[in-house]
Amino acid sequence: VPLAWAGYAWGSHLLTLGSLWRGSRARPLATLTFDDGPDPETTPRVLDALAEHGVRGAFFLIGRRAAAYPGVVRRIAAEGHDVGNHTWSHRSLWLCGPRATRREVLDGHDAIAQAAGQPPRYFRAPWGMTNLAMFPLLGPLATPCVFWSVQPEGRRPAEPAQQVARCARRAGPGAIVDLHDADGVPGAGARLTGALPGIVDALRGQGLTLVPLRDLL
């Protein structure tokens, strides 16, 4: 059983070849994406900053948080950002069998659709951890799995200046930048609001135009 479970989890990475990691390198475009929200305090501040800088991005929302804060979700959609499904509860899909995976994907999708008034366009697995049961659920929903090419802050805290420097160093045409507007990592939201203006300036300083995910892919 342990070996079978390991194959179920690890074997799914063969299927991530069908997922989207970046846009075309032929166009000077990039997209900012935000995971783990909505957060009732941080997400509105992020939306304010994006509006101030004239940027639209993509928010990968946790279903149960979307159900708790539907007003924030409606604002995300109303301001022209793409809405994505980040599962119902942010469980690692490596720890989910087929039935639990179905709940995470479909319940998340439905909760976000109800809060946003429109279905999610994309899906992103928590921590990038997929499984074999996930992909057959995404096709009928028409939600491709989208990961990222640049992650300024991953599982370890990174101060705003570090995040800006990583973006400047690693991003290029087609970049999908993965940011976090809720505290999956403690304090992530506060660090993001400090880093976001510098990230926008750094990417634009490289000649990149920041566009919604739907215009990048």
Q: Across the structure, where does each feature detected by a protein language model lie?
A:
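Glycine-enriched alpha-helix->loop->beta-strand junction motifs that scaffold or abut catalytic
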Residues: 53, 79-83, 139-148, 173
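Alpha-helical scaffolding segments of alpha/beta enzyme cores, especially the outer helices
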Residues: 45-48, 71-78, 103, 107-114, ...
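His/Asp/Glu-enriched short active-site or ligand-binding loop at hydrolase and phosphoryl-transfer sites
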Residues: 129, 134-170, 208-217
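Hydrophobic core of alpha-helical transmembrane segments in multi-pass integral membrane proteins
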Residues: 1-6
